[in-house]
Curated annotation (Swiss-Prot):
NCBIfam families: IF-2, small_GTP
Matching PANTHER family: TR-TYPE G DOMAIN-CONTAINING PROTEIN (PTHR43381:SF5), TRANSLATION INITIATION FACTOR IF-2-RELATED (PTHR43381)
Keywords in alphabetical order: Cytoplasm, GTP-binding, Initiation factor, Nucleotide-binding, Protein biosynthesis
Positions of region (G1): 202-209
SUPFAM superfamilies, per database record: Initiation factor IF2/eIF5b, domain 3 (SSF52156), P-loop containing nucleoside triphosphate hydrolases (SSF52540), Translation proteins (SSF50447)
Subcellular location, record wording: Cytoplasm
Superkingdom of this protein's organism: Bacteria
Binding site for GTP: 202-209, 248-252, 302-305
Cellular component annotations (GO), alphabetically ordered: cytosol
Protein name: Translation initiation factor IF-2
Amino acid sequence: MSKTRVYELAKELNLSSKDLISRLNDLDIKVKNHMSTLEDEEVDLIMDLLSDKPQQTDEINQQEEDIFEDNLEDLEEERAYKKSFKKGGKKNKKNNKKVILTEEKQEDEIKIITIPEFLTVKELAEKMKVNPTEIIKKLIAKGIMVTVNQQIDFENASKIAEEYGFLVDKEEVKDELELLLEEAPDDEKDLQPRPPIVTVMGHVDHGKTSLLDAIRNTNVTMKEMGGITQHIGASVVEVNNKKIVFLDTPGHEAFTAMRARGASITDIVVLVVAADDGVMPQTVEAINHVKAANAPMIVAINKIDLPTANPDKVKTELSELGLVPEEWGGNTICVPVSAKKNIGIDNLLEMILLVAEMEDLKANPNKPARGTIIEAKLEKGKGPVATVIVQNGTLQIGDAILAGTTYGRVRAMFDDKGKRIKKAGPSTPVEVLGFSEVPEAGDKLIVVEEEKKARELAERRKELQKEMELKRKQKVSLEDLFSQIQEGSVKELNIIIKADVQGSVEALKKSIEDLSNEEVRIKVIHGAVGAITETDVMLASASNAIIIGFNVRPETNAKNLAEKEKVDIKLYRIIYDVIEDIKAAMKGLLEPKYKEVELGRAEVRAVFRVPGVGNVAGCYVLSGKILRNADVRIIRNGIVVYEGKIASLKRFKDDVREVQQGFECGIGIEKFNDIKEGDIIEAYQMEEIPR
């Protein structure tokens, strides 16, 4: 919310600052001096009140101001005269009058400086004409350790400036990076149709790769008669003199990872579902990822040549997920195909072109190129190599390029067949050589005027990246949900549910979505059975969602990724607790008492029967350490089967207090004998969270 200084409003209303302060105090708006700030609501109130007297206001204000100033002058002269009379001289009267006038002059002189979002201590000192050492001392006193050439943010710089009596304005001028990223809208007459960019998704073994091969081979048979070598992560197919670009980045993991980085290059998604298996867990995941990205979808029902194929069953399952086929009165295009027997491939390609036509995909080829990195690697003999999809403009040999924090000049380009080319227009996938470093998938590629400028901008981006890392975007979590609702930053709470059985997923989904209210809508964007995976975390990061785990645990890699991406994972064993925690978070009543600290994980390699004791697990400690007094949970195939405490911990025949990573040990679990080889024993402690 913007704030207005008293003197600024007085100037706007053609009033003196003193007169405005008096009027504000009459309205119970407490201000101290002309530098005090007013909220937008207070400014609106004053403007409304004063605008009620349009004819007389200026004259009355001027009269009041003149009378006030005359009275003030007389009063000041009288005070100065009395003071000088006491000291016995006319000279003092004159001097005191001079002092009063000087003070008035100083009050009227308001020092204003304009500073950017970030600037160095030296730059701030130069703007205020003070010694940089003094600023450094003040910053150190605030706990900010800096040197003269280090950058500080606007907030800290403005606080320092105000201590020196400066009024600070924020520089709104956009830097070159922002201006570059802001693509000017194209004139309608310059736009030309471009090929659609298609991503193929689906459950493992449902025939994604086979379908892509069938599409490519059909095209090759028509064009070249012979084999084809795939050189880059995308391929171009020509149908009826129209091109379609297929991205070969497999699975929805890459799709979501790129979306999390702001790259949305896919125009159409082809969802592959096997006619015999039907909708599977990964199919549901893929559907949820596509819905979250709001991309058009075509369903390819594959393997229709099999005797067990049942396309109607697939359509029924899709309808239950909200994808009603066109022939059943819905909007989802379903195409029966067989990648193996080459059935329905032409029909699928025609449907893709039809959807592309409906989407009216256009771009301007007559301008400097912009695109997205879809793959990047360091290749022997070539250096940093990146596969780029050109989205607008035309990329040419010799162009100076910027992508993320890397820069360079296009030295060579190769198309999807490995053929060297000199230029690439919109929707063309090309392999580009000439980068200074390996860029990241999802980085935007921009052509700039010259390589020197590209290098400067890349260095600037590196600095900004470091600064942004320090001020990393706060992901939503249950603990701070209420405050974010109050601030208005959360209008919709996205949730991902992972549970041990499908019944729990459905029960949780219904119960959680019923908690929606006027302030915040709760939306379950994905629900599935099994352990929490890296894919779940990436979807949560891209959609700013909370992950709820019910009777399941996160995989080790997923847990590490969640920490890196600042994704909140909550684990429960009772449905009631899930509902109550979300309710409490929404009301601002959530009081976390304890947090779980993972100590270590051990794998059961053998099980021994000990007379009078029961089963003892022969274990190898995979990570961390196992403590004798720790709480443990037994995890079997990603699902928690038991929670309890360690009854005994031995190394060889000796009782020990702890066993470190990389060592073997014997673990006995209290009141639990159903331990099996391959089970994971996870040791943890509960620590109280200070409030």
